[in-house]
């Protein structure tokens, strides 16, 4: 599928600073399209039904057009604004026995060739029937039979949603997932054993536009973004695909123009990955640094490229220790701290925080208890 520039009466010229960043952030459909100095019509409707051709086959798809005026400001207009109306988050609208059938819009590999493994950004069309809030998760039921329960479907796999409630196309009809393909290699032979590969992650990464997908949810309240205080500080810590909910947070803070939702606090992201090629959504985050230097900080831990102060591999907990004085002061002043990623990251982080607390003459157990009591501590690991 391609997105063609059009010339009509009333069209305006749009100069795009970063083609690749815009393509990944908004259009997601075609990796070869050029956006420089194109003219875009302000009157094209959303969701024009078309077909896309992939591997010689036709797939139904949707042309998405972004409103022209959005490019003249630093933020994007979103709709429908009614998504802001509910006072409580949507929960479990669809359950495993009565799941929702959505469609795949696009699947894009979002890591470089030197990254260990493959991670995909997957856009799903739910047609506005599966509303969610930032920080929630969808459940995915892969096709096929559960090998442990003959005749029964596969178990639900949960994935953090990597977009705001308005989706990657800002129209409230899509949601995005960030999925690492789970591949098993035999420790003795070093060869891949497809029978032990992750069923759901491989299904998602192999999906094509137009493929159907069974969704449950949305679920989760622990990682919901508190928005009652626009001046709040949010410290976000992630490894790998754990960055997914933070992409939604940051888009809401810095990319989208939502009425009465102006963020003037501090968002501080710590991301741990193997190497530069493994960085996820790096162009988006780097743009926020440029556009909002007073409200966004971004620190990376590249375990295969950097060394910590002891000469070992640089992990995210080493970055936390490096900035521990600032982090503890921010927590003392009410900052929220979030953790998302592999559960194996938490022991090292907890040990670091405990050691730093003791060096400061504080009890970490007491401090952690207080953070939980004040609802400043948010953890979602898998």
UniProtKB/Swiss-Prot annotation:
GO terms for molecular function: copper ion binding; ferredoxin-NADP+ reductase activity. It catalyses: 2 reduced [2Fe-2S]-[ferredoxin] + NADP(+) + H(+) = 2 oxidized [2Fe-2S]-[ferredoxin] + NADPH. PROSITE patterns: FAD_FR. Residues 97-225 form the FAD-binding FR-type domain. Keywords: Chloroplast, Coiled coil, Disulfide bond, Electron transport, FAD, Flavoprotein, NADP, Oxidoreductase, Phosphoprotein, Photosynthesis, Plastid, Transit peptide, Transport. It is an enzyme of class 1 (oxidoreductase). The modification Phosphothreonine is found at residue 233. The modification Phosphoserine is found at residue 201. The keyword Transport applies. Disulfide bonds join 200-205. NADP(+) binds at residues 235-253. It is found in: Plastid, Chloroplast. Expressed in shoots and roots. More abundant in roots than RFNR1. Induction: Up-regulated by nitrate in roots while down-regulated in shoots. Its main location: plastid. Its EC number is 1.18.1.2. Residues 1-64 form a transit peptide. GO terms for biological process: photosynthesis. GO terms for cellular component: chloroplast. InterPro entries: FAD-bd_FR_type (IPR017927), Flavoprot_Pyr_Nucl_cyt_Rdtase (IPR001709), FNR (IPR015701), FNR_nucleotide-bd (IPR039261), FNR_plant_Cyanobacteria (IPR035442), OxRdtase_FAD/NAD-bd (IPR001433), Riboflavin_synthase-like_b-brl (IPR017938). Its cofactor is FAD. Maintains the supply of reduced ferredoxin under non-photosynthetic conditions. PANTHER family: PTHR43314. This is Ferredoxin--NADP reductase, root isozyme 2, chloroplastic.
